[in-house]
Structure formats: C-alpha cells, structure tokens
From Swiss-Prot:
It comes from the Eukaryota. This is Cytochrome P450 27C1. Residues 1-80 form a transit peptide. Widely expressed, with highest levels in the liver, kidney and pancreas. Heme binds at residue 488. Keywords: Heme, Iron, Lipid metabolism, Membrane, Metal-binding, Mitochondrion, Monooxygenase, Oxidoreductase, Transit peptide. One of its GO terms (molecular function) is all-trans-retinol binding. Residues 32-46 have a biased composition (Low complexity). The keyword Iron applies. Residues 20-75 are annotated as: Disordered. Its EC number is 1.14.19.53.
Amino acid sequence: MQTSAMALLARILRAGLRPAPERGGLLGGGAPRRPQPAGARLPAGARAEDKGAGRPGSPPGGGRAEGPRSLAAMPGPRTLANLAEFFCRDGFSRIHEIQQKHTREYGKIFKSHFGPQFVVSIADRDMVAQVLRAEGAAPQRANMESWREYRDLRGRATGLISAEGEQWLKMRSVLRQRILKPKDVAIYSGEVNQVIADLIKRIYLLRSQAEDGETVTNVNDLFFKYSMEGVATILYESRLGCLENSIPQLTVEYIEALELMFSMFKTSMYAGAIPRWLRPFIPKPWREFCRSWDGLFKFSQIHVDNKLRDIQYQMDRGRRVSGGLLTYLFLSQALTLQEIYANVTEMLLAGVDTTSFTLSWTVYLLARHPEVQQTVYREIVKNLGERHVPTAADVPKVPLVRALLKETLRLFPVLPGNGRVTQEDLVIGGYLIPKGTQLALCHYATSYQDENFPRAKEFRPERWLRKGDLDRVDNFGSIPFGHGVRSCIGRRIAELEIHLVVIQLLQHFEIKTSSQTNAVHAKTHGLLTPGGPIHVRFVNRK
C-alpha cells in the first residue's frame, strides 16, 4: 500500500500541479526571528544537576550581589519522597495538584528527580515569560525521546510535534501556510458546521433515549466523537462517521488505538523513570506504546492514501485539482509522503482529546453557572440571532464566547505543564540554569495564583474582556496553547471548532445540571481530563 501510494504521489507531482488558490491561497512567510538569548555562561566546574534537595522557600527574584546561585542551592523534594508521591500515592493522576503542592513547599522555582530525569520546575508568570522569550528559532521540547525512538524503530518520519531543529523548522514553515492564522482556518467554517449539525442531531437522539427526555450521559464521549470528526474533516478532507449510529470499523479501531495511547500514560511514566536497560524485564509499557502508535499510523496512512487515489482519479479525467490541507501537502512537494503520514497522524492525535476535553469542561461550567450561560446567550441572540448559523467571521461579534473559552482553559488547561530544554545558560529566579537543563513550566499552578488572576478559583469569563486597566489579564499567567514559534499550530482549528459549536449549542439548548450531575474533578492522564463522566440536560430553548 505504502509503495503504491508513493508511486501515485510521484505521478501527481510529475504532472507539475500546484494547489489551486480558491481555498485561501498561500501565505508567504520567512523564518521566525531569533530572540536575543537572556543567558549567562557557567562558571568552571558548575554542574547541570545536584541530587541533594535544598531548603524550602522562595528564592530571590534576581541575582544576589555575589552572583546567581548554583542548582545545588535550589530547593525541591528529595528523590525518594518524589518517587513515593508518584508510585505510592497515585501522583501520576495528580500532577497538576503536585505542581501547587511543591510550589507552596519549595517556592516558585524548584528542582526534582524522577528516576534518571532531572527537572527544574518553574511556577512563576514572569519566570515562565523569561524562559519563553529567550527561546531561539527552534525551541527544544522535553520528553519526546520515546516518540522518536518508536519512529526510528519502525522507520517512520517525525512529525511537527516530535521533530526538532532544522527538521521542525521546515515542517512548521510548510504547515503554517494553511492552519496558523485565523483567516487561513476561516475557510473551514462550512465543513465544521456540517459536523456540528450532525452533533446536534445526535444530541436530540440521545435525549430521546433518556428517562427525562433531556439528559445526555457522559458528554465526554459525545464530544470526543465530535472533535475527531471535526479535526479529520480538515486534516483528511473526508468524514469518518464518528457521529453515526453505526461507526465504521476502521474508525472504531482508531478510537481504540487512541484510547490505548492515553490509558497507558501511567505505565509510560513508569517506564520513563526506569533506565532503558531494564526494559526487557518490564516489556509491557513499551510494547503497548508501540502497538498504539502502529494503530494510529495505520489509520492515517489509509486515509492519506485514499486522498491520493482521489486526486489521481480527478487528474486522469482532466479535472482541475483543488482542496484543503492534505491536497496542499501533496501538491506543494514540500514534504515527503512519509512526512505527510507522520504529520497528519500527530496532528490528529493532538487535536482530538484536547478539543473534546475543553468542550466537556465548557459545558460542565455552563451547566453549573446558569447566570454566566444566560449572559453569553443574550450576547449571541443580540449580535447573531437565535438561529443564525455562525462562521469564523461572526466570532468577533461575540467576545463573551471567546472569553468563555479562555476562562475554561485557565481553570482546566489541557496541558497542565509544558517542557523545554534550555538552549543557552540562563539566570532565572536568581539561579544559574545551565544549557541542556530540562525545564517544566507549571501552567496549572500559575493559572490559579491570585496575583495573576484575582479570585483565581472563581469562574469569571468577563475577566478576559479588556476594560482599560481594570482587571487586566497577563497572558503568561495562562498560556494553554503555548507561546512563540513552538506554540500549538492547531490552535486556530481548535478555537474554530469550539467557538462555533458553543454558539450553536446555546442557540438550540439551555444546558442544565441533572439529577445525575456530580461534581467532577480534574485528573492528569498526560492531558488534564475530567476525572469522571459529565452528565447534563439539554433543554429546548423556548
């Protein structure tokens, strides 16, 4: 299959075709500018890590008169205590809470060991900003070794998420042409609205099967299928049937592979804490990791190859070829077929659960805060109407809908933390951080700090509406999509999917709690997920 697909792509490219411009055209873009590094050279003999733990307490905001401190002086949990937190007290599902716990105990910058890994954690808005602003043209992410090892083992290319350096720069420069800016993604409004129409039909069906005629149980599962259908519509330029009564078997197999990927997060973390030479004695985590990736790549390859055949069919009949992202990738010749397989696989993986979890939390918060829901609904009716089907052009007319998404992501950031590897020596929080040190940016902790967001534990979407200098929001306190050149490239797709579906859900339904609605707390499974099923009532608007 793969060989024939490569031959087919070669035939298409030999025809000298280029993407048709009517889908938005190509945007020119040069390489990102390199910020000036904020660094300092290490003194002779300095080490990148020290296994002893310093005393609890917040370090000074800047260097002392005698110069910055070494990592040996940095506070943090002792190695055995840290391992006990994760292995004995289920810390893998509480990573977001452990961020806050360690920040209270050791201050806003602290070190820790997790098996062979040494990490400096940062839970301060200004320090996070310093790290991100000091990044070069190709920032290096942390903890992607297992992804790259799998690709080397199977002879697969890396995608945008797993690539580094010049390879990452090349891929981003290609993909950014079609999905990085709002106006690039706006052309997909029609496709997304078709998926939303199917979602609303599905809600009506599920309601009819409930005793009260209104409750939909486990909206997490419903929004997972919506997100998968929506992302795939853009990536593959085809529908998967996720919202049908009978889901196609190929799609079912992909869902199973995706669920395996996230369900094995804890075992993957166990494996990360154990040296590689021990893997033969505990083979299951790595074996399951590879099996799930095999399923994800298989699914993507089938759909990519189907699109290739469709393009060839059109060419054979003398038709002009045009299309969306995948068609552009084929015809631009900017990526190899293997790189196309890798990128669509990684982007679908990254886009499904991130969108579905955020949408589940949004509906949960609206159900529990009817006064907020009513305010948002009034804005929609006033500015768009009760039944107007919105497009991307309508979203700026409803700023509260955008504020709702920002506030949901502040309270429940999909990624509770982010990783970086320092590319220069940096002085952060009064400590000298050597080049090559792994950093953990604690976004969950900064999102809940009152100095960043007054009354931080409260759900207040209006805080994101700019009103002069009152209640101003500092973006580095909550950056759910990241910052700079390594920020989430699928951000605009996720925002489009969520903004449009929230508007239409509120146009059709009043979202309420039901007798089955329980308090739902967050858990970490790689991503920040609802710790249990979310049940709500979708009541017809009168």
